[in-house]
């Protein structure tokens, strides 16, 4: 954790890592083609165990989520992809709307993944969850004054909040969750208030928001948990 920065972790789990089977043609050839936006060693370990247990080789195609989804659209029915592995339910919604996914029936998936973490039509399933949280300077912010996203709209935080652009999928998913929880009108009012409270124009990555707090540019930031530590 960045020294001098505290974190609110009990807000809401919103950034889901998701996977969905696209086809089965490669399985017949003892090869599984995975289009992956992820870059974690844990995935490599999982893939190796799968190959050791089944004898099926895994071919991983790397790229950003948007690039991979666009590739699936371009390839159409001729796509060699079997699985799309990416982050955030918002991106999986885009993939579903683009028509590049198909439903899967699996008792194992149904048994291990709750309905709240999978598509209603079983076109994608959540593997892990992470939180989009509020971080703040322990020296400049009293934790008793800040415990929810709604608190960020208070005018006392004017000129003190750092956040990346609203064009980022993580913030779009956050906004979607607030619309679901509070309604569109209240969520829009909240967003306008937070904008007025920004310490600077939105820029950079989640890590840049944490750096802004650590350097004193801002007192509060919104970011994903896995960037902390």
Regions of interest found by a model, annotated:
Residues 30-93:
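Early extracytoplasmic/lumenal segment of secretory-pathway proteins
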Residues 37, 41, 63, 80-218:
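Extracytoplasmic ligand-binding site segments that recognize negatively charged/polar headgroups
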Residues 23-25:
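N-terminal signal peptide c-region/cleavage motif recognized by signal peptidases
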Residues 46, 189-190, 224:
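Short amphipathic alpha-helical coupling segments at ligand-binding clamshell hinges
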Residues 68-69, 92, 209-210, 227-228:
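Short, hydrophobic alpha-helical packing/hinge segments within bilobed ligand-binding/sensory domains
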Residues 18, 27-28:
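Cleavable N-terminal signal peptides
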Residues 2-16:
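Bacterial N-terminal signal peptides that target proteins for export
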Residues 216-229:
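C-terminal lobe and pocket-closing loops
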């Amino acid at each position: 954790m960045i020294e001098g920065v505290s974190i609110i972790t009990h807000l809401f789990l919103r950034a889901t890592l998701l996977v969905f089977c696209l086809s089965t043609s490669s399985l017949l050839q003892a090869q599984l083609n995975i289009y992956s936006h992820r870059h974690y060693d844990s995935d490599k370990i999982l893939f190796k165990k799968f190959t050791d247990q089944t004898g099926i080789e895994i071919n991983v195609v790397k790229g950003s989520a948007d690039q991979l989804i666009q590739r699936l659209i371009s390839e159409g029915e001729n796509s060699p992809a079997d699985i799309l592995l990416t982050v955030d339910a918002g991106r999986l919604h885009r993939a579903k709307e683009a028509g590049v996914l198909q439903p899967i029936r699996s008792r194992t998936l149904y048994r291990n993944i709750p309905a709240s973490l999978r598509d209603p039509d079983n076109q994608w399933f959540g593997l892990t969850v992470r939180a989009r949280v509020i971080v703040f300077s322990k020296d400049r912010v009293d934790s008793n004054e800040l415990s929810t996203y709604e608190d960020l709209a208070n005018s006392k935080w004017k000129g003190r909040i750092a956040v990346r652009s609203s064009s980022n999928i993580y913030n779009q998913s956050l906004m979607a969750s607030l619309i679901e929880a509070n309604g569109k009108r209240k969520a829009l009012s909240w967003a306008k208030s937070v904008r007025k409270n920004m310490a600077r124009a939105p820029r950079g990555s989640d890590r840049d928001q944490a750096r802004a707090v650590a350097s004193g540019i801002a007192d509060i930031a919104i970011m994903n948990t896995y960037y902390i530590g």
